């Protein structure tokens, strides 16, 4: 809730920064997905007012984006492509703004709850165990743990790798840092103990949990989506989160801060997989067919999976039980009404195969 309230606070600030009239935001909207989407749309619009057309960049499931300096400097980590881009439109000493943002980004910790992605406050705490440690090597080929090394690398980048481009009325200065080739594996390794714990607790395959995490967030603990799915496994508070709380006999739904904790997120996401596997889709007898259904349901819901086969849920389960697993896979990847869910099954299934081979 803290970060949602921050959006309410900064919306008028962003508008004033860009010279636009303040627009009132109804706090009641934040209680549902539509409200969050409206707030995010406003946030994106206000970033456009500051940075210009075609320069809107906001955090996503596989993109960490943090603004500082009255929204004139930003750090972007693309966890899919493996690139960090630090940019500024500051007109006074842009190199200094870039340098500070580089240092802060390289040394940030892995606690998403401590960083507000929607504020321009530089609330990034220098960590003794940086999240990017081992994922970035400096110009001497060394990993970066200490502030002095990050500062030396920042100086090197600003002096030798500075780029400049013009976009609209702005001159944008930037530097780009490549993550190491196996950055995905390094992030996955961080969470293996948590994955193993959740796997044993709920009876869900480790390989499936890892495949879901890779597909949902590329192991980005700061992951957010336009529909307010949160964290490594992109758990939605009022759907999967609520179901898990009900399973535990708890009222309500998990908080945003709860789901931004990596261990809580993995535990909740895995618990939801177990609910799908054992309850909603537990009548599917073949374990491979059930796994295909569970994967698709994690993305689009159990009801939509069963409706692919029949509008009657009991009959749908019977139809699936009369099919070969390969036919179930073919049906879900070609006849599910949502293209995202069709592609999701393909992606997760392929990722799971790679984790099973390790």
From Swiss-Prot:
Single GO MF annotation: hydrolase activity, acting on glycosyl bonds
**Residues where lipid is bound covalently (S-diacylglycerol cysteine):** 17
Q: Where is the lipid attached (N-palmitoyl cysteine)?
A: 17
Does the keyword DNA repair feature in the UniProt annotation? no
User: Which EC number applies?
Assistant: 4.2.2.n1
Q: Name one GO biological process term.
A: cell wall organization
Entry-linked Pfam families: Mltc_N (PF11873), SLT (PF01464)
Q: Name one GO cellular component term.
A: cell outer membrane
Where does this one sit in the cell?
A: Cell outer membrane
For this protein, what reaction is catalysed? Exolytic cleavage of the (1->4)-beta-glycosidic linkage between N-acetylmuramic acid (MurNAc) and N-acetylglucosamine (GlcNAc) residues in peptidoglycan, from either the reducing or the non-reducing ends of the peptidoglycan chains, with concomitant formation of a 1,6-anhydrobond in the MurNAc residue
Q: Which InterPro entries match?
A: Lysozyme-like_dom_sf (IPR023346), Murein_transglycosylaseC (IPR023664), Murein_transglycosylaseC_N (IPR024570), Transglyc_AS (IPR000189), Transglycosylase_SLT_dom_1 (IPR008258)
Write out the entry's keywords from A to Z: Cell outer membrane, Cell wall biogenesis/degradation, Lipoprotein, Lyase, Membrane, Palmitate, Signal
Q: Does the keyword Signal apply?
A: yes
Membrane protein topology class: Lipid-anchor
| Principal subcellular localisation of the protein | membrane
**Where in the sequence is the signal peptide annotated?**
1-16
Q: Can you tell me which family this protein belongs to?
A: Belongs to the transglycosylase Slt family.
Q: Which PANTHER family match?
A: MEMBRANE-BOUND LYTIC MUREIN TRANSGLYCOSYLASE C, SOLUBLE LYTIC MUREIN TRANSGLYCOSYLASE-RELATED
Entry function = Murein-degrading enzyme. May play a role in recycling of muropeptides during cell elongation and/or cell division.
Q: What is this protein called?
A: Membrane-bound lytic murein transglycosylase C
């Amino acid at each position: 809730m803290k970060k949602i309230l921050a959006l309410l606070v900064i919306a008028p600030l962003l508008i004033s920064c860009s010279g636009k009239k303040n627009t009132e935001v109804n706090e009641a909207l934040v209680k549902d997905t539509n409200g969050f989407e409206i707030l995010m749309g406003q946030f994106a619009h206000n970033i456009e007012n500051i940075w210009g057309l075609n320069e809107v960049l906001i955090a996503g499931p596989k993109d960490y984006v943090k603004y500082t300096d009255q929204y004139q400097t930003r750090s972007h980590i693309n966890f899919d492509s493996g690139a960090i881009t630090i940019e500024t439109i500051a007109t006074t000493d842009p190199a200094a703004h870039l340098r500070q943002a580089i240092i802060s980004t390289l040394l940030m910790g892995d606690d998403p709850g401590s960083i507000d992605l929607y504020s321009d406050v530089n609330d990034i705490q220098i960590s003794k165990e940086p999240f990017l440690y081992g994922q970035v090597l400096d110009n001497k080929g060394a990993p970066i743990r200490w502030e002095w090394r990050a500062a030396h690398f920042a100086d090197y980048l600003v002096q030798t790798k500075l780029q400049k481009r013009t976009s609209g009325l702005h001159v944008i200065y930037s530097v780009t840092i490549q993550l190491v080739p196996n950055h995905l594996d390094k992030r996955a390794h961080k969470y293996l103990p948590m994955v193993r714990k959740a796997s044993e607790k709920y009876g869900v395959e480790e390989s499936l949990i890892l495949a879901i995490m890779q597909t949902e967030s590329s192991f980005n603990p700061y992951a957010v989506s336009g529909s307010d799915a949160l964290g490594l496994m992109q758990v939605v508070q009022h759907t999967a989160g609520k179901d898990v709380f009900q399973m535990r006999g708890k009222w309500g739904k998990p908080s945003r801060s709860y789901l931004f904790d990596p261990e809580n997120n993995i535990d909740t996401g895995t618990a939801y997989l177990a609910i799908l596997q054992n309850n909603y889709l537990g009548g599917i007898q073949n374990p491979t067919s059930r796994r295909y259904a569970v994967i698709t349901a994690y993305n689009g819901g159990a009801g939509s999976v069963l409706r692919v086969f029949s509008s009657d849920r009991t009959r749908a389960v019977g139809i699936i039980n009369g099919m070969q697993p390969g036919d179930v896979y073919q049906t879900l990847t070609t006849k599910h009404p949502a293209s995202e869910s069709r592609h999701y099954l393909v992606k997760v299934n392929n990722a799971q195969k790679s984790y099973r081979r390790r």
